[in-house]
Amino acid sequence: MESQVRQNFHKDCEAAINRQINLELYASYSYLSMAYYFDRDDVALPGFAHFFKQQSEEEREHAEKLLKFQNQRGGRIFLQDVKKPDRDEWGSGLDALECALQLEKNVNQSLLDLHKVCSEHNDPHMCDFLETHYLDEQVKSIKELGDWVTNLRRLGAPQNGMAEYLFDKHTLGK
């Protein structure tokens, strides 16, 4: 059955949103894996665990916001299999933050590609939606993760275990 509310919503935009939903769910899944890795008794970095759990919830919320947008515009949701995270063991806090930084950059690039598709199909509503709810937040997240990677390296991580402990306690534990 065709949507009654669909207007100025190109099939390419609809398909790109479905791909972005999948990527946001993959990011959520990856962060959830990181969170419970750092919660293990042999890793025991609760600040990292809490931070990655929050990131997982935020990425899931991003996916849900896109699902709602798809319905509001009269698009159809086609969920795909969510890929398993690239690893099960995340190593040090520095290793995990470097993975998170790359993940956020990948999500950002995908959002920029999505914005380009909606611009090419003259969809100002979708462009505004992405600019308002996603693009600025992504840039801020990338900057924060980059700063944290720099600070951990400056403290001597991953060779210096005390560096990660103090970062966990004082930066992530606030």
UniProtKB/Swiss-Prot annotation:
In liver, forms a heteromer consisting of middle and heavy subunits. The functional molecule forms a roughly spherical shell with a diameter of 12 nm and contains a central cavity into which the insoluble mineral iron core is deposited. It catalyses: 4 Fe(2+) + O2 + 4 H(+) = 4 Fe(3+) + 2 H2O. Residues 7-156 form the Ferritin-like diiron domain. This is Ferritin, heavy subunit. GO terms for molecular function: ferric iron binding; ferrous iron binding; ferroxidase activity. It is an enzyme of class 1 (oxidoreductase). Gene3D superfamilies: 1.20.1260.10. Transmembrane segments: none annotated. Belongs to the ferritin family. Fe cation 1 binds at residues 24, 59, 62. Fe cation 2 binds at residues 59, 104, 138. Stores iron in a soluble, non-toxic, readily available form. Important for iron homeostasis. Has ferroxidase activity. Iron is taken up in the ferrous form and deposited as ferric hydroxides after oxidation. Also plays a role in delivery of iron to cells. Mediates iron uptake in capsule cells of the developing kidney. Delivery to lysosomes is mediated by the cargo receptor NCOA4 for autophagic degradation and release of iron. Its EC number is 1.16.3.1. The keyword Transferase does not apply. The keyword Iron applies.
